């Protein structure tokens, strides 16, 4: 299964959170399960993603929510309209 973000065209692939062309980004990847109509993203914060010891920086959480929800919406819309994720947007 290929991550939804990997279907994004190059001009959309620079996002700090999920852009595969952003060398310094987080490279968040979301996976769609068409049978369940659900998506999943897994991400393990690194020690340098902390706000204070033991707590993840809020900006990282916002990036996770943003990138995961955008990819999920794209996959859900594609499925609802019977489109392939591989089709050009």
Language-model features: where?
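Terminal targeting signals and extreme-terminal segments of soluble enzymes
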Residues: 1-89
